[in-house]
C-alpha cells in the first residue's frame, strides 16, 4: 500500500491523471457507434437457383439435392435448409458464429462450381448467392405512390433508380422491390380468333420475336467519311406491335391486333402491393452482415432528398417503417436510468455520511469510473447498446462500493480525532485488501461468461467486459483518488445538516443497536439460523425448477410482421382481396400507425405485412397485447390466416417462418413425413402453451394433370415439344422478346387473354398446328383431370423436412411450450423414421437451458478459487459464498412476483448477485480475521464486533447497489422489457440477502471456524454456546 501513498502526497498528479481518464472517456463516448444490442448475427448465405417450369419435386431432386451435397461439405456449416417451389430453389446456409462471412462466401462459390456438372442443363443461369439472411426483418421500408403513374412505371423508377442507388449505400445488404413488376408489352391472345385464322400460338411468338431483333448492322466508309448503319429493327411500345402482320389469309393480312389485345403493362400481373389502403411499390431494405443499423439508416435518410429529386414530383417517396427511432428511444431511456441511478447512489451516500464534502468524493469517483469505461469500449470495438449501458447502470451501485468502504473507514478515523492525511494513510491501508478482494472476486464472476461459447457468450461479452472495466477503474480510483480527496477535503467537525438528516443518523444508530441485540440472540440460537440457511438452498432448487423460462425477453420494437397463409388452391385475385381485408382489420386498431403489405409472384397463396405501431408513449398497449387483440379479430376471416409476431433484434436461423419459434420434422421418406406432419400439427395446435401454430408443408395445391396420347400424337404429326410449347405460350406469361432501353431491359410477354387464364375449360379451346398445317384441338390427343400437387418441397440437411412454427400466447413461456411439444411427440407415438428437433431460437434456448446451471456453478467455483488465493484458506471463501442462497431465493421470488420468466437477462442478474452479495461477507470476515489475529479475541467476539463495526458500510453499499438497479425496475419506456428482468433480479436478491446474510454469515463463520479448529487440533467439535 506504500505505492498508493504517493497519490495522497501528490494531489496535482492524481487530479490530472483522473482528468485524463475522464477526457479520454468523453472523447471515446462521442466515437462509439449506436446499436440496439451487440452484434451477434450468425453468418448466413442464401443460394438461389431457377429452372423455369419445373415442379417443386423436380427442383428438390435435380437442383436442391446436388447443391446440398456440395455445400454440406463446407467447414463451419451448422445448419442447411432448402425450399423448392415452382421453378425455383433457395438453399440457406447458417455458419458458426466465428466463421468469417467472406471466407464462407468463397467456399460457397467453390461448392456451386463443383456441383455445376450435376445440375440440369436447361437452367437459364448459374446458381447465385447473397450474404443476407432472408429471415431478418428489414431495417427500413420505403413506399412509392402516385395518382398519375401506373404501378409498372413506379416499379421501374424503384428498381432502376432508387434500389440501385440505395444498394450502394454503405451497410446496405439487399434492397428488394415488390408490389408489381417491370413494365412490359403484354400480348393477350384470343384462341378462338387464332383458330378461325388457322394461326398457331407459336407462330405468333416467332413473328413477334423476329420483328424485334437488336443486331449490329455494321458500317460503310470511304476515304473521307464513315457511316454507321442503324435500322428500325426494334419495337418498343404496344402501339407499334399492334400492326404487325402475323399471317396472310387469302391475300388479306392478319395483324396482331386482329387476334390479340396488345397493351403497355407489366411483366407479371399477379403482383400487388399496398400501403394504408393505397396501391404502392414497396422497397424493403436489409442491412449487410455486421453493419450498424443506426449508421446505415442515417446514411439512407441522407440520400432520400436526392432520390426524391431524381424522380417526378408527382411520385411520393415515403418511409413506411424505420427501425432507428425505437432504438434511439430505448437507448435514451437507458441513459436516463443511468443518470437517475448515479443521482440515487450519491443521495444514499449523502444521507449516510451527512456531509457535502464527504459526498463529493464518491460523486467524483462514480462518474469517472463509468466515463473511463467508454475508452475500453472504444478500443474493444464495442457499441453503445442496451446491454452495455445496462452494465454501466448496474455498475453505478458497484463502483461506489469501493469508494464507500475507503471513505467510511477514513471518516471513522477522522471522527476519532486523527489528522486527515494520517487517517487517509491508515484507512486505505486497513481496507485496501478488502477493496481488492471485493473487486477481484466480482470480476471473477464474469470469467466463465467471457469464456462461454455460442450466442449467449457473444451476446453478453460486451456486458461483462464493460462491467469488469468499470469495476477495475473503480478499484484504482478508490485506492488513489478517493484517499487523496479524503485527505484534503474531510475535516473533523460535527455535520451541519438538516433535522431530517440528523433524524436519519439517530435512526441508523438505533438500527445498529437493535441489530446488535438481535445478533446476540441469533448467535445463541445458531441451529435455527443454520436450518433457515439450509432451507434457502432447497428453496432455490424448487424455485429454479418451477419458474417459467424463456430465451430472451420479448421485445417491443414498435414493429410487427404479418404472414398471410391462405388455402393452397387460392387464386391471385382472391389472395389480393384477402390481403386488403386483413390490412383493413389491422389498420383499424387504435395502436397501429402504418400498414404495408404485398402478395403475388412465386408466393401464390401467401402474403407479407409490415406493421408499424404508434410510439409507446401514446399507445394503450404493448406489442404482445396488440397481437392478442388482433388475433381474435383476424380469426373470423375465412379461407386464410394472418400470423403476427413482434419483430425482435435477436432471431436465429435462416428460415422465413410465419412465427417466432420453430420445430422441424425430418424424414428420409417424404411419404412418411406427409403422413405424420398433419397429425403432429393438429395435436400441437391444441396445446394451450402454443399460439399461431402453422406449417410450411404445402402438398395440397391444385393442379391439372394432362395425359398425352402419344400414339395419336404420332399419327397426327404432333410432338410433345409442340404440345408443351402450346401450354407455355398460352398460360405461362412467356417472355418472348426483349426491349432494350438506356437504363434497363424490358420484356414482351405473351399469354392468352384473362378470360381464358381464369377458366380451366379453356383447355378445350387450345389447339396445335400440325406438320400438315391443320389445327388440331388439344382434346384430340390429351386428356386432363384435377389433382393435388405440392407447392413446395423442403429439406433440412439432406432429409425431407417440414417446419412447424409457433408463437407464445400472451403471458406464455418458451419452457412450457417446448415441454408441451416434447410431451405431445411422446404421446403420439411418432415412429423413429420421423425425427423432430427444435430449430432457430428455440434450438438455442434448449442448448442454453442445459448450460445455465453449469455457468452458475462455474462462476461460483471461479469466485471460490479467487477468494481462496486471496485469503490463503479453503474455509473462509465458503463462509463468504454462504450469502448466495438467500440472494438466489430473493431473485427468483421477485421474478415470480412480477410474472417475469427466467431469461438470459435474469441469468445475468443472478451472476451479478454472486458478485454483489458476497461483499457484505467479505467486509465482515476481513475485520473478524484481523481482530482474531491481531487483537487476540475469540472468533465469537471477533465476528460480533465485525458485524457491528461494518454495519454502516454494509447498509450503504447494499442500498447503493439496490438504488442503482431500481431505475431498471421502474422503467416503462422503450426497451423496458429488456431492463426490467435485470433490475427485478438484483433488487429482489439484494433485499432478501440483506435481511438474511446479516445473521447467517456470522453463524456460518463460527461453524467453519470451529470446524477448522477441529482439524487443526484433532478434537471433537464442541457445540456453539447457547
Swiss-Prot record:
<protein>
    <recommendedName>
        <fullName>Multidrug resistance protein MdtC</fullName>
    </recommendedName>
</protein>
<feature type="transmembrane region" description="Helical">
    <location>
        <begin position="897"/>
        <end position="917"/>
    </location>
</feature>
<feature type="transmembrane region" description="Helical">
    <location>
        <begin position="431"/>
        <end position="451"/>
    </location>
</feature>
<dbReference type="InterPro" id="IPR027463">
    <property type="entry name" value="AcrB_DN_DC_subdom"/>
</dbReference>
<keyword id="KW-0813">Transport</keyword>
<feature type="transmembrane region" description="Helical">
    <location>
        <begin position="853"/>
        <end position="873"/>
    </location>
</feature>
<comment type="similarity">
    <text>Belongs to the resistance-nodulation-cell division (RND) (TC 2.A.6) family. MdtC subfamily.</text>
</comment>
<dbReference type="InterPro" id="IPR023931">
    <property type="entry name" value="Multidrug-R_MdtC"/>
</dbReference>
<feature type="transmembrane region" description="Helical">
    <location>
        <begin position="528"/>
        <end position="548"/>
    </location>
</feature>
<keyword id="KW-0812">Transmembrane</keyword>
<keyword id="KW-0997">Cell inner membrane</keyword>
<feature type="transmembrane region" description="Helical">
    <location>
        <begin position="333"/>
        <end position="353"/>
    </location>
</feature>
<dbReference type="GO" id="GO:0042910">
    <property type="term" value="F:xenobiotic transmembrane transporter activity"/>
</dbReference>
<feature type="transmembrane region" description="Helical">
    <location>
        <begin position="463"/>
        <end position="483"/>
    </location>
</feature>
<feature type="transmembrane region" description="Helical">
    <location>
        <begin position="360"/>
        <end position="380"/>
    </location>
</feature>
<feature type="transmembrane region" description="Helical">
    <location>
        <begin position="984"/>
        <end position="1004"/>
    </location>
</feature>
<feature type="transmembrane region" description="Helical">
    <location>
        <begin position="953"/>
        <end position="973"/>
    </location>
</feature>
<keyword id="KW-1133">Transmembrane helix</keyword>
<dbReference type="GO" id="GO:0005886">
    <property type="term" value="C:plasma membrane"/>
</dbReference>
<keyword id="KW-1003">Cell membrane</keyword>
<feature type="transmembrane region" description="Helical">
    <location>
        <begin position="387"/>
        <end position="407"/>
    </location>
</feature>
<feature type="transmembrane region" description="Helical">
    <location>
        <begin position="12"/>
        <end position="32"/>
    </location>
</feature>
<keyword id="KW-0472">Membrane</keyword>
<dbReference type="InterPro" id="IPR001036">
    <property type="entry name" value="Acrflvin-R"/>
</dbReference>
<dbReference type="Pfam" id="PF00873">
    <property type="entry name" value="ACR_tran"/>
</dbReference>
<comment type="subunit">
    <text>Part of a tripartite efflux system composed of MdtA, MdtB and MdtC. MdtC forms a heteromultimer with MdtB.</text>
</comment>
Amino acid at each position: 500500500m506504500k505505492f498508493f501513498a504517493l497519490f495522497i502526497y501528490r494531489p496535482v498528479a492524481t487530479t490530472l491523471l483522473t482528468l485524463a481518464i475522464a477526457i479520454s472517456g468523453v472523447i471515446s463516448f462521442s466515437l462509439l457507434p449506436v446499436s440496439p444490442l451487440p452484434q451477434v448475427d450468425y453468418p448466413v448465405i442464401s443460394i438461389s437457383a431457377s429452372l423455369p417450369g419445373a415442379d417443386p419435386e423436380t427442383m428438390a431432386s435435380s437442383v436442391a439435392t446436388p447443391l446440398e451435397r456440395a455445400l454440406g461439405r463446407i467447414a463451419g456449416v451448422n445448419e442447411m435448409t432448402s425450399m423448392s417451389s415452382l421453378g425455383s430453389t433457395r438453399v440457406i446456409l447458417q455458419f458458426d458464429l466465428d466463421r468469417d462471412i467472406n471466407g464462407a462466401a468463397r467456399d460457397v462459390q467453390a461448392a456451386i462450381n463443383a456441383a455445376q456438372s450435376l445440375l440440369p442443363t436447361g437452367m437459364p443461369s448459374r446458381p447465385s448467392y447473397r450474404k443476407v439472411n432472408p429471415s431478418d426483418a428489414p431495417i427500413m421500408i420505403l413506399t412509392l405512390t402516385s395518382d398519375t403513374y401506373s404501378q409498372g412505371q413506379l416499379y421501374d423508377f424503384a428498381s432502376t433508380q432508387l434500389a440501385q442507388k440505395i444498394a450502394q449505400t454503405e451497410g446496405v445488404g439487399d434492397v428488394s422491390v415488390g408490389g408489381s413488376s417491370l413494365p412490359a408489352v403484354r400480348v393477350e391472345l384470343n384462341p378462338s380468333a387464332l383458330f378461325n385464322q388457322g394461326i398457331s400460338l407459336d407462330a405468333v411468338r416467332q413473328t413477334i420475336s423476329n420483328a424485334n431483333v437488336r443486331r449490329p448492322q455494321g458500317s460503310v466508309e470511304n476515304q473521307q467519311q464513315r457511316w454507321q448503319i442503324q435500322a428500325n429493327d426494334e419495337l418498343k411500345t404496344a402501339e407499334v406491335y399492334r400492326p404487325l402482320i402475323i399471317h396472310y389469309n387469302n391475300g388479306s393480312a392478319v395483324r396482331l391486333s386482329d387476334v390479340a389485345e396488345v397493351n403497355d403493362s407489366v411483366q407479371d400481373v399477379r403482383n400487388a402491393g399496398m400501403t394504408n389502403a393505397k396501391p404502392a411499390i414497396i422497397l424493403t431494405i436489409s442491412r449487410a452482415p455486421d453493419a450498424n443499423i443506426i449508421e446505415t439508416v442515417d446514411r439512407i435518410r441522407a440520400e432520400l432528398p436526392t432520390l426524391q429529386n431524381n424522380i417526378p414530383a408527382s411520385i411520393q417517396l415515403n418511409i413506411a417503417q424505420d427501425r432507428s427511432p425505437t432504438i434511439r428511444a430505448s437507448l435514451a431511456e437507458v441513459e436516463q436510468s443511468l443518470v437517475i441511478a448515479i443521482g440515487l447512489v450519491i443521495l444514499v451516500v449523502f444521507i449516510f455520511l451527512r456531509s457535502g464534502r464527504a459526498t463529493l468524493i464518491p460523486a467524483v469517483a462514480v462518474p469517472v469510473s463509468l466515463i473511463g469505461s467508454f475508452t475500453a469500449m472504444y478500443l474493444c470495438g464495442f457499441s453503445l447498446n442496451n446491454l452495455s449501458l445496462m452494465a454501466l447502470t448496474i455498475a453505478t451501485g458497484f463502483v461506489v462500493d469501493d469508494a464507500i468502504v475507503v471513505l467510511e473507514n477514513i471518516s471513522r478515523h477522522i471522527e476519532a480525532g486523527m489528522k486527515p492525511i494520517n487517517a487517509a494513510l491508515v484507512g486505505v491501508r486497513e481496507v485496501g485488501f478488502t477493496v481488492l478482494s471485493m473487486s477481484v472476486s466480482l470480476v471473477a464472476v464474469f470469467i466463465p461468461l467471457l469464456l462461454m461459447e455460442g450466442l449467449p457468450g457473444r451476446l453478453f461479452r460486451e456486458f461483462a467486459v464493460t462491467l469488469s472495466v468499470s469495476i477495475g477503474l473503480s478499484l484504482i480510483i478508490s485506492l488513489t483518488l478517493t484517499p487523496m480527496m479524503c485527505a484534503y477535503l474531510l475535516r473533523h467537525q460535527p455535520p451541519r445538516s438538516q433535522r431530517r438528516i440528523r433524524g436519519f443518523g439517530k435512526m441508523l444508530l438505533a438500527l445498529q443497536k437493535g441489530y446488535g441485540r438481535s445478533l446476540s440472540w441469533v448467535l445463541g440460537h445458531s441451529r435455527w439460523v443454520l436450518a433457515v440457511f439450509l432451507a434457502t438452498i432447497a428453496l432455490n432448487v424448487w424455485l429454479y425448477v418451477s419458474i417459467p423460462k424463456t430465451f430472451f425477453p420479448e421485445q417491443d420494437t414498435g414493429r410487427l410482421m404479418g404472414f398471410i397463409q391462405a388455402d393452397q388452391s387460392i387464386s391471385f385475385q382472391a389472395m389480393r382481396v384477402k390481403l386488403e381485408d386483413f390490412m383493413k382489420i389491422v389498420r383499424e386498431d387504435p395502436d397501429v400507425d402504418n400498414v404495408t403489405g404485398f402478395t403475388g409472384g412465386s408466393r401464390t397463396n401467401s402474403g407479407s405485412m409490415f406493421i408499424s405501431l404508434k410510439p409507446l408513449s401514446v399507445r394503450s398497449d404493448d406489442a404482445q397485447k396488440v397481437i392478442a387483440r388482433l388475433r381474435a379479430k383476424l380469426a373470423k376471416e375465412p379461407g386464410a390466416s394472418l400470423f403476427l409476431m413482434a419483430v425482435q433484434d435477436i432471431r436465429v436461423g435462416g428460415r422465413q417462418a410465419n412465427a417466432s419459434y420453430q420445430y422441424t420434422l425430418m424424414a428420409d421418406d417424404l411419404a412418411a413425413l406427409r403422413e405424420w406432419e398433419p397429425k403432429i400439427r393438429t395435436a400441437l395446435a391444441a396445446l394451450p402453451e402454443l399460439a399461431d401454430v402453422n406449417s410450411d408443408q404445402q402438398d395440397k395445391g391444385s393442379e391439372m394433370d394432362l395425359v398425352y396420347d402419344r400414339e395419336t400424337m404420332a399419327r397426327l404429326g404432333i410432338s410433345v415439344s409442340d404440345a408443351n410449347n402450346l401450354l407455355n405460350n398460352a398460360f405461362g406469361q412467356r417472355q418472348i422478346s426483349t426491349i432494350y432501353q438506356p437504363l434497363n431491359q424490358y420484356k414482351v410477354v405473351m399469354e392468352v387473354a384473362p378470360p381464358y387464364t381464369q377458366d380451366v375449360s379453356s383447355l378445350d379451346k387450345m389447339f396445335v398446328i400440325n406438320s400438315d398445317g391443320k389445327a388440331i384441338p388439344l382434346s384430340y390427343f390429351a386428356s386432363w383431370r384435377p389433382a393435388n400437387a405440392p407447392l413446395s418441397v423442403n429439406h433440412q440437411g439432406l432429409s425431407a423436412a417440414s417446419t412447424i412454427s409457433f408463437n407464445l400466447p400472451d403471458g406464455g413461456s418458451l419452457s412450457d411450450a417446448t415441454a408441451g411439444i416434447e410431451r405431445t411427440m411422446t404421446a403420439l407415438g411418432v415412429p423413429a423414421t420421423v425425427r423432430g428437433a427444435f430449430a432457430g431460437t428455440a434450438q438455442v434456448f434448449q442448448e442454453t437451458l442445459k448450460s445455465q446451471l453449469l455457468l452458475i456453478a462455474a462462476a461460483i467455483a471461479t469466485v471460490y478459487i479467487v477468494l481462496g488465493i486471496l485469503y490463503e484458506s479453503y474455509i473462509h471463501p465458503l463462509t463468504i459464498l454462504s450469502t448466495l442462497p438467500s440472494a438466489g431465493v430473493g431473485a427468483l421470488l421477485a421474478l415470480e412476483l412480477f410474472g417475469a420468466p427466467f431469461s438470459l437477462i435474469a441469468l445475468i442478474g443472478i451472476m451479478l448477485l454472486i458478485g454483489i452479495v458476497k461483499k457484505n461477507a467479505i467486509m465482515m470476515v476481513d475485520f473478524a480475521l484481523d481482530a482474531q489475529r491481531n487483537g487476540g479475541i475469540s472468533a465469537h467476539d471477533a465476528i460480533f464486533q465485525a458485524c457491528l463495526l461494518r454495519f454502516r458500510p454494509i447498509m450503504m453499499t447494499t442500498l447503493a447497489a439496490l438504488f442503482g438497479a431500481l431505475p431498471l425496475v421502474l422503467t416503462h419506456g422503450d426497451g423496458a422489457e429488456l431492463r426490467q428482468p435485470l433490475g427485478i433480479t438484483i433488487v429482489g436478491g439484494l433485499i432478501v440477502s440483506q435481511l438474511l446474510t446479516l445473521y447467517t454469515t456470522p453463524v456460518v463463520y463460527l461453524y467453519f471456524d470451529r470446524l477448522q479448529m477441529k482439524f487443526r487440533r484433532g478434537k471433537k467439535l464442541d457445540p456453539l454456546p447457547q
